[in-house]
Amino acid sequence: MKTKYSCLNREKRVTDQKLGVRPRLSATPCGYILPMSGYEEEVQERWGDTEAYAQSQSRTSKYTHEDFAAAKVDQEAATELFVYAFGNSLPTTSEKAQAAVVAHRVAISKWFYECSIEMQKNLALMYVQDPRFKKYYDGRVNGLAQYVHDAIMAQ
């Protein structure tokens, strides 16, 4: 088993090197590279009256630093699935790309709020329209934001 695991890690490292993937090592409260401080007013204005916002506030208000780190790990795992699919030029409708879509939605639902397919599609629009979110994905691999968007929209 150890050999198989080592081979998978080597394969991932080679793929990452080919793509120029830049790893993310820090945990952030919302699971994205965006720091929460400085955005509270914008978040409140845009989503403050939604059920998702209330659910997220209720959940995260009880989280410890370890909880936020675990949420980050789950979201990074979903992002890595997108990186793999994109890096291997898989269609956005492929089984691997759609597994990344599901992992993305599950991570959000687990840690923040129930994320419906419709809600996830709204997030996908934000990933390509908001430069801050686009930078998060394209900071990993150039073009990843559009791929994530397209994969989510393809479900």
Language-model segments: what does each one mean?
Residues 2-155:
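Amphipathic alpha-helical "stalk" segments
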